Regions:
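Conserved "HGTGT" condensation-loop signature of ketosynthase/thiolase-family condensing enzymes
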Residues: 1-181
Length: 181
């Protein structure tokens, strides 16, 4: 197993490891704008409606693919797998959905909030944008998240039909994405 590229985002910085990029940013909307079209090749459908973890996941994957020199294009499919994890699952999205449900008299909540109540939704949004057709898996671990998710991704590389897997650990404080081959 080899790490071909790494993209990362903290609360005010982003970067790529192999290309030795490290820059500041103000917010995710401005980061999204400044990465187009060099790193984010074409607009991400519904990006402004994404929850925070979906934005972090998608942008970090773009950074990691750029770092790994893997190109993607609109409509182009690639057999690349996607494994994701984080420390809270979809807790923030579930809380936002429930608050919206309460605010609407316990009868309705907005559907655009519901989709992100599943912890695999950020991965699915990214897979759609980048045309990834390999296996998609969300993992939840109580301890050793980095080590256990890396072990799982490596095991998948050994037995799956894909030669490349993207591993994302998405958290609001720090998101790191690695392209494994």
């Amino acid at each position: 197993m080899m790490i071909k590229g790494t993209g990362w985002i903290t609360q005010d910085k982003y970067g790529c490891q192999k290309k030795k990029i490290q820059q500041n940013f103000a917010d995710l909307k401005s980061l999204y704008s400044c990465l187009q079209p060099k790193i984010i090749k074409y607009p991400i459908a519904n990006f402004l409606r994404f929850d925070t973890l979906s934005k972090l996941t998608t942008i970090s994957i773009a950074l990691a693919l750029f770092d790994a020199k893997i190109t993607y294009a609109q409509g182009k499919k690639q057999n690349i797998g996607l494994v994701g994890t984080n420390s809270n699952g979809a807790l923030e999205a579930n809380l936002a959905f429930f608050d919206d449900y309460i605010a609407n008299g316990r009868t309705l909540a907005r559907g655009n909030l519901f989709i992100y109540t599943l912890p695999s939704s950020p991965l699915a949004e990214a897979a759609i944008h980048f045309g990834l057709t390999g296996k998609l898996l969300y993992l939840g671990f109580e301890e050793n998240i980095e080590r256990e998710s890396l072990k799982c991704a490596c095991d998948m590389l050994k037995v799956e039909s894909t030669k490349t897997i993207i591993l994302v650990n998405a958290n609001p404080q720090k998101t790191i994405c690695r392209v494994l081959h």
